[in-house]
A protein has these predicted regions:
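Glycine-rich phosphate/diphosphate-binding loop of Rossmann-like nucleotide-binding domains
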Residues: 194, 198-311
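Structured beta-strand/loop patches that form or line metal/cofactor-binding pockets in enzymes
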Residues: 40-71
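Adenosine-phosphate binding glycine-rich loop
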Residues: 1-23, 218, 318, 333-445
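Phosphate-interaction motifs
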Residues: 59-120, 124, 128
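Rossmann-like adenosine-cofactor binding region
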Residues: 262-363, 368
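Flexible, glycine/charged-enriched surface loops at secondary-structure junctions
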Residues: 21, 37-44, 117, 154-163, ...
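Glycine/serine-rich phosphate-binding loop and adjoining beta1-alpha1 elements at the start
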Residues: 94, 113-227
Length: 445
């Protein structure tokens, strides 16, 4: 395989999809050496088959707002690869959603799901609809219209969606209800459901908790842990909230959180009481993070910025893709950051990743570090299939074990000659090899 040529061909065939190209380039650049040890892969044109989605559904979603106006949005579902299990990946509702972003997310999801060792393929879906500022009734009407198109393409053994940015328990509940009405069946077609619908305990917490479990495994390699360490967290949604919760539980100090308007810096630290305030502000009142600075004296609020210029020991990007650029990464290194562990999907640009790796700090890519969410989704699928529910303690122990195993796989495939662990390479090669072998065993499809 010539990675540069493969990428050039993809850019020619699928122009104007920069996020998708970025995700493919990151994977190809790290697996090329391992791939070329297997000439049978080239003979089967494996890399091209793996880079291009199995299928993409694109559709119009028409709904009526509270004023009686007819609104139109675009809906998508990218079914990327099902070599090791049914398509699995979230649904995102955000104004920025487009096909390029969803193709990148589905591509990443394929390898992330492979790393968990659970039988799940990769997919992703969503819409450019934003729930922000919409009434509960408007969100319900949109979701029901969205499901009128999507329902026939999903199912417990075909494609199992979940939540993502803009899609929480409320939206998953509406989707599940509409699917049940249309399909005439009560099955585990969605994960991230409420407990009353067959959802799993620890699922809301899983991505954030899993990120910290992975971080702890990395820190162990340096003979340390989180006690007394200061952390920068971006975002203030589900992932950021439970990342912060687990940091506090492990003895760390959270200095920042953010939203799309700006970030807060609390030199005293965001403690349990303050985190509860943020959870209530965001989950119940759907407020803005600046209100935290109005609530607590001594807190700095920076409009229109991200927290990466602040001094801390650890950075935990938990908001969105490409939120840390090369300049941000240089600031983090200059300020003494020893570890970056990604709760969001691809939050660091290629330039930022290069800075982290050249500085030889601990850097965990999202496909490894944030695999906790989809891991517990997989455990939810298992519980649904056997018609049983596990305790929170059981699920949490399984999550810890999965994250530890992912870390071990990254170390196995990513340790370089000088002993530095390239977690990007390790995650990509480990995830790729399982999918590649499964595809080869199934013939040319």
């Amino acid at each position: 395989m010539n990675a540069a040529k493969v990428l050039e061909d993809l850019k020619r065939r699928f122009p104007n999809e920069p996020e998708y190209h970025q995700a493919v380039e990151e994977v190809l650049s790290t697996i090329e050496e391992e791939y070329n040890k297997h000439p049978e892969f080239d003979k089967a044109n494996l890399i091209e088959r793996l880079c291009i989605p199995d299928r993409v559904y694109q559709f119009r979603v028409t709904w009526v707002d509270d004023k009686g106006n007819v609104q139109t949005n675009m809906g998508y579902r990218v079914q990327h690869n099902n070599a090791i299990g049914p398509y699995k990946g979230g649904i995102r509702f955000h104004a920025s959603v487009n096909l390029s972003i969803l193709k990148f997310l589905a591509f990443e999801q394929t390898f992330k799901n492979s790393l968990t060792t659970l039988p799940m393929g990769g997919g992703k879906g969503g819409s450019d609809f934003s729930p922000r500022g919409k009434s509960n009734a408007e969100v319900m009407r949109f979701v029901q219209a969205f499901m009128l198109e999507l329902w026939r393409h999903i199912g417990p053994e075909t494609d199992v969606p979940a939540g993502d940015i803009g899609v929480g328990g409320r939206e998953v509940g509406f989707m599940f209800g509409m699917y049940k009405k249309l399909a005439h069946e009560f099955t585990g077609t969605f994960t991230g459901k409420g407990r009353e619908l067959g959802g799993s305990l620890i699922r809301p917490e899983a991505t954030g908790y899993g990120n910290i479990y992975f971080l702890l495994e990395m820190l162990k390699t340096k003979g340390t842990d989180l006690k007394g360490k200061t952390c920068l967290i971006s975002g203030s949604g589900n992932v950021a909230q439970y990342t912060a919760e687990k940091v506090l539980e492990m003895g760390g100090k959270v200095l920042t959180m953010s939203d799309s308007d700006g970030y807060i810096y609390d030199p005293a630290g965001i403690d349990r009481e303050k985190l509860d305030y943020i959870m209530e502000l965001k989950n119940l009142y759907r407020g803005r993070i600046r209100e935290y600075a109005e609530q607590y004296p001594g807190v700095k609020y920076v409009e229109g910025a991200r927290p990466w210029g602040e001094k801390a020991d650890i950075a935990l990007p938990s908001a969105t893709q490409n939120e840390i650029n090369g300049d941000d990464a240089k600031k983090l290194i200059a300020n003494g950051v020893m570890a970056v562990s990604e709760g969001a999907n691809m939050p660091s640009t290629p330039e930022a990743i290069k800075v982290f790796q050249e500085a030889k700090i601990l850097y965990a890519p999202g496909k490894a570090a944030n695999a906790g969410g989809v891991s517990v989704s997989g455990l939810e699928m298992t519980q649904n299939s056997i018609k049983l529910g596990w305790s929170a303690e059981e699920v949490d122990e399984k999550l810890k074990s999965i994250m530890k195993n992912i870390h071990e796989a990254c170390v196995q495939y990513g340790t370089e000659a000088d002993g530095y662990v390239n977690y990007v390479k390790g995650a990509n090669v480990a995830g790729f090899m399982k999918v590649a072998k499964a595809m080869m065993s199934q013939g040319i499809l």
